[in-house]
Design a protein with these regions (language model features):
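Non-catalytic, usually N-terminal nucleic-acid engagement modules in DNA/RNA processing proteins
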Residues: 1-103, 210, 214-215
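Glycine-rich phosphate/ribose-binding loops and adjacent secondary-structure elements
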Residues: 86-89, 102-218
Length: 218
């Protein structure tokens, strides 16, 4: 659960430098308690806390789950990024406590490395996640305004992470990004890219992209 799409747009849009001003604004306010947002369906207001985030993911039955965090857009300044990172660290500890209180061994919790595009903040966040009792580590937060910057952030972050935990790259899954991530030591990825292509009649095959929507169905 990243408090990002509620207010800032998608990670893909950020990497491409797009800002969709026509999207309904569902995020109302982020506080120490959690994120208050409005349903785009009926306008009902909800409060998503770190504890509620873990409870929801537990009920979903996911094999690995993540702490609640705020994923800041790349264009915010370092002061805001630091403030957000510190709050996300506190949320991570609350998420960890909630998970431990109900852990039955069927799910694993990942902490999320924050810090945006600022290397010293990334180092600080990596130390925090390394030194707390998470099963795995997710590389999250803003990864930059371009693919090259994203690759640089991932590379420098991976160099700081402990080697005895699995590492997941949040929201990134382009073909070149996967190859780069694996080279850096990333174990798993998640991305809408394959299913988005499929919805539009495409598929990922060697050596690249294949258009299927005009092909006869057998």
């Amino acid at each position: 659960f990243q408090i990002f799409s509620l207010g800032h747009g998608s990670v893909a849009s950020e990497i491409k430098g797009r800002r969709n001003t026509n999207r309904p604004k569902t995020l109302i306010k982020i506080t120490e308690g959690g994120a208050k947002f409005k349903s785009y369906i009926d306008g009902k207001v909800f409060m998503l806390t770190p504890e509620e985030s873990i409870r929801i993911q537990r009920l979903l039955g996911a094999d690995f789950i993540v702490v609640l965090d705020e994923c800041t857009p790349f264009h915010v300044d370092k002061k805001y990024t630091k403030k957000s990172m510190d709050m996300s660290h506190r949320w991570a500890l609350r998420s960890l406590t909630e998970w431990k209180d109900h852990d039955n061994g069927s799910q694993k919790l990942y902490g999320i490395v924050q810090g945006g595009v600022y290397e010293d903040l990334r180092d600080e966040s990596a130390d925090f996640i390394n030194n707390n009792d998470f099963y795995g580590i997710a590389v999250g937060g803003s990864l930059g305004a371009s693919k090259n910057q994203m690759h640089d952030v991932v590379s420098s972050t991976m160099a700081k992470l402990r080697k005895d935990r699995p590492v997941h790259l949040l929201g990134i899954g382009g073909i070149s990004d996967i190859f780069h991530g694996v080279t850096c030591g990333i174990d798993t990825f998640d991305c809408v890219h394959p299913t988005r292509l499929a919805r539009h009649g495409g598929a990922l095959v060697k050596p690249g992209f294949y258009e299927t929507k005009n092909e006869p169905v057998s």
